[in-house]
A protein has these predicted regions:
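Accessory beta-strand-rich segments of carbohydrate-active enzymes
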Residues: 12-13, 17-20, 24-33, 45-53, ...
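Substrate-binding clefts and catalytic carboxylate motifs of secreted carbohydrate-active enzymes
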Residues: 18-21, 27-35, 40, 184, ...
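Active-site-adjacent substrate/metal-binding segments within catalytic domains
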Residues: 52-97, 101-117, 179, 205-206, ...
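Aromatic-lined substrate-binding rim segments of carbohydrate-active enzymes
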Residues: 125, 132, 335-381, 439, ...
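Extended acidic/polar, glycine-enriched regions
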Residues: 129-137, 224-284
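Intrinsically disordered, low-complexity Pro/Gly/Ser/Thr-rich segments with frequent PxxP/GP/PP motifs
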Residues: 227-241, 668-716, 784-811
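Terminal connector regions
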Residues: 242, 260-266, 701-753, 805-828
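Active-site neighborhood of glycoside hydrolase catalytic domains
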Residues: 355, 371-464, 623
Length: 828
């Protein structure tokens, strides 16, 4: 039986509360009054200065350094407002700040009414008796976050709380762990340092006689009793349709209207679903499982990690969020992890995830650091967590809370060179913050979801070890993060056979059309100051080229701009191939237990999106353009996948299915193609095999040497293996896939394919013709927003037709004029 429990907590103002919005035009001034201008609230200082022409685009070239002074200054916001007499006569008046970034002192009519020190929480200040008949003056003095963090760090004299500063390559600010602010705003290895200041969410005056509703929340309970309490009400529904993740069923959302006599009513969406994080013994394994069960069904999570969409949150639009989430869904993703170094996303993000069936792994905003545990810090964190859980727990898309990103691992593997004698002190602080406070609040506020203290973690095994495991990366338990940039990513045996891969990935550069918006032509060289400046990951550019060079000949055009464009292309090829190999390994490991490891039930590659135009691990560029990786994700996250590997000289092909009940009868079709001909050298077809529902099944195994001998006229270097799954009747049921038998850099017979297009026809179809087989065929239309139905593909026929879906009005002529076509053999 399904019920929903409604909780009323004394906000949603309506009939019983008079609201005066204070959003709109304010005045903004810096500390010495040398800068004074009109500002929009919600907003931030950087955006205001740019809109008023005081500065240019902060993302342009080296402006992140040139505009550092903005974050080092203090700023004052001022507004005037009047209150109607009939409103002023009510009993109570409260000023509500939904979000201040970050440290501020607020005064009304010259009287200090409160202070803020946390950008992640709402502040309410009672101003009854302070309102005037005439104009009221409201001022918000915002202190430099950099200065505040430094002062708090230096005041913490008993022991250090590392890290002090980010690596020099990040060009960032220090002591971000001492301020409750987006940790990445002081810099990260994929983004700039812009420690923003401002009133980043709405401001309003609420006037009322008695009380007001602060929030409505709902939770799903399974109970046969109907109980009515003073503060909540259980409502029984005889029959409801469940909410399912994308690819597993419909996302049923119900309109729920709540009428409160005091204040009127409100209508919002509710849904019904259950979630469990299953950690239980596995036969033939010394560890525990780690997987999500939604509505009683095990679900393999397929997705990525989400970082802030923009350094300046006031510039994040609904369209930007929608494009990214739709892109995730189009890539067959059913999950995203909101990473703990950014922000709790805005309401529209979670509402869209509810609609699209995208499950959310929600971190709390602590990342890659240790944190202080003074009383005032703990107090503001407790309020932050309480507010965020109450705000988000009604969303069916949110399926798990996680206390932090990598902080258990930071202590366990000694990131910060803490002495053995001092370690217990830091473990105590860790337990105090994440277990005794954050976990305690979450369990009180929301009993319907699992809570993990950290990621990666060994889950219940970490708990047994006092919350900090000896090895939080142990693949027998919990989730893992894994990065290795110098090992050959084509060697799938090097990847951990983990229960759940919540972070992994490789860098690439975004397209030239994306970079050109923030650079000049002299920057378009991998050895330029711009290329070095934009790379915030130590040795990142070298790692990309070294990894690419293992399997590809690097571009050698004598035209510097063309060489730059080609090098960008080769980094995207490398990234797509590396992540594909790793992801397919995880997907076909879901049914395996080998040496106690396996039963992988989730892959969230790092990362979905970008915060600016620069090199990163993303599959979608800043602005929404898909990298090659994202196109490939649509295939390696397909509901039914054929995945091939070479193991001990054998070609193994697995059939992987996300289905819960249907066993698919499939044939595996394998073709060997020569690089010098469109005709298959030979073809093989397996007998009909059943793919296990919700599992992985070996559907084809053959000695590669025997296969080459059997086919004749093929060597590892001269041929490629293409394969797919079909029904017994021959219908395609998995994406086409392929496996190289040697590195493409050693390919024999691979020629320049001379790809041409016949122009764009109605509905934006592009027909391609080539003279020889081509690999990694890439179509780019520069700045025209949209995406192709396939891209970065293997072209084994003389003709191929691709569809472009535009995100804005365009013409065939515009697309044709901007179309660039590249294949691997074209870059050397």
């Amino acid at each position: 039986m399904c019920f929903t429990k409604l909780f009323l907590a004394l906000k949603r103002p309506s009939l019983g509360v008079d609201i005066i919005s204070l959003n709109g035009k304010w005045q903004l001034m810096n500390s010495n009054s040398s800068v004074s201008l009109s500002a929009e609230v919600p907003g931030c200082v950087h955006t205001t200065l740019q809109r008023q022409g005081f500065i240019s685009d902060p993302y342009y070239r080296f402006n992140d350094l040139a505009y550092r002074w903005i974050s080092l200054d203090n700023w004052t916001y001022t507004t005037l407002f009047s209150v109607p007499t009939h409103v002023r006569g009510k009993g109570k008046a409260v000023l509500v700040f939904e979000g201040v970034d970050t440290v501020s002192t607020i005064s009304l009519n010259g009287v200090t009414i409160g202070k803020t020190d946390n950008m992640f929480r709402r502040y309410d200040f009672e101003v009854t008796g302070l309102l005037k008949d005439e104009e009221n003056v409201l001022q918000v003095w915002v202190m430099s976050a950099v200065t505040y963090a430094s002062q708090r760090s230096h005041a913490h004299t008993e022991y250090r709380v590392p890290p002090d500063c980010p690596p020099p390559v990040q060009k960032g600010e220090c002591h971000v762990n001492f301020i409750r602010k987006a940790q990445s705003s002081f810099s990260w290895d994929w983004g700039p340092s812009f420690p923003t200041l401002g009133i980043w969410k709405g401001v309003r005056l609420e006037v009322f006689n008695t009380s007001r509703v602060l929030s409505y929340t709902t939770i799903l309970v399974n109970n046969n009793n109907l109980d009515i309490y003073d503060d909540n009400k259980c409502v029984h529904f005889k029959s409801v349709s469940l909410w399912w993740p994308f690819g597993h069923g419909e996302q049923f959302l119900y309109y729920l209207t709540i009428d409160v006599n005091l204040e009127g009513g409100e209508t919002f969406n509710v849904a019904f679903r259950t979630v469990e994080l299953v950690q239980e013994p596995i036969p033939s394994s010394p560890g525990l499982s780690f997987y999500f069960r939604i509505n009683g069904k095990p679900i393999f999570l397929k997705g990525s990690n989400w970082i802030p969409v923009h350094a300046f949150q006031d510039q994040v639009t609904t369209d930007m969020i929608t494009i990214l989430l739709r892109s995730a869904q189009k890539a067959n993703m059913n999950a995203l992890r909101v990473w703990g170094g950014g922000v709790y996303e805005q309401d529209i993000f979670y509402s869209l995830c509810d609609m699209y069936g995208i499950m959310i792994w929600q971190d709390f905003m602590f990342a890659c650091a240790l944190y202080p545990t003074e009383k005032d810090f703990i107090q503001t964190v407790r309020e932050e967590v309480t507010q965020q859980v109450r705000r988000l727990k009604s969303h069916p898309s949110v399926v798990i809370w996680s206390g932090n990103n990598e902080n258990e691992a930071a202590i366990a593997t000694d990131w910060f060179n803490i002495s053995v004698a001092a370690r217990p002190l830091y473990v105590k602080d860790y337990v105090n913050l994440y277990v005794e406070n954050i976990r305690d609040i979450v369990l009180q506020e929301d009993s319907t979801r699992p809570f993990l203290v950290s990621s990666p973690t060994n889950g219940v095994e970490s708990e047994k070890e006092g919350w900090v495991a000896k090895d939080p990366y142990d693949p027998h338990y919990g989730d893992t993060h894994y990065y290795s940039y110098y090992k050959d990513c084509w060697d799938w045996t090097a990847f951990p056979r983990t229960r759940f891969a919540s972070e992994y990935g490789f860098q690439s550069w975004p397209s030239l059309s994306t970079l050109s918006k923030v650079s000049v032509s002299s920057d378009w060289d991998f050895s330029s100051n711009f290329s070095a400046h934009r790379q915030h990951h130590e040795d990142g550019n070298q790692q990309m080229l070294k990894q690419a060079e293992l399997h590809y000949i690097l571009p050698n055009s004598t035209d510097p701009v063309q060489k730059y464009r080609d090098t960008i292309y080769i980094t995207q090829v490398m990234q797509a191939q590396c992540v594909k190999i790793q992801t397919e390994f995880y997907r076909h490991s879901r049914s395996d237990i080998i040496e106690g490891k396996g039963h992988t039930m989730g892959t969230l590659y790092w990362q979905l999106n970008d915060i600016w135009q620069g090199p990163s691990w993303s599959s979608v560029e800043f602005g929404g353009k898909w990298k090659m990786l994202h196109y490939w994700a649509t295939d390696f996250y397909a509901p039914i996948l054929s995945a091939g590997v070479e193991d001990k000289g054998d070609l193994l092909i697995y059939g992987v299915s996300d289905s819960h009940s249907e066993k698919h009868n499939v044939k595996t079709k394998v073709r060997l193609h020569s690089w010098s001909s469109f005709n298959a050298v030979c073809s093989l077809e397996s007998n009909v095999t059943k793919i296990k529902a919700g599992g992985s099944t070996l559907v084809f195994q053959h000695s590669i040497s025997a296969l080459l001998t059997q086919c004749g006229n093929c060597t590892r270097r001269s041929c490629i293996v293409a394969f797919h799954l079909s029904s017994p009747e021959g219908q395609l049921i998995s994406p086409h896939n392929h496996i190289f038998l040697s590195s493409p850099r050693y390919a024999e017979g691979l020629q320049k394919p001379n790809i041409t297009d016949t122009g764009i026809v109605q509905n934006f179809f592009v027909t391609l013709h080539c003279s020889f087989p081509a690999v990694y065929v890439w179509l780019d239309v520069d700045n025209i927003p949209g995406h192709f139905d396939v891209n970065g593909f293997l072209m084994l026929s003389k003709k191929s037709t691709v569809l472009f879906g535009a995100w804005r009005p365009t013409t065939a002529e515009e697309i044709t004029a901007n179309l660039h076509i590249t294949s691997l053999r074209d870059v050397y």
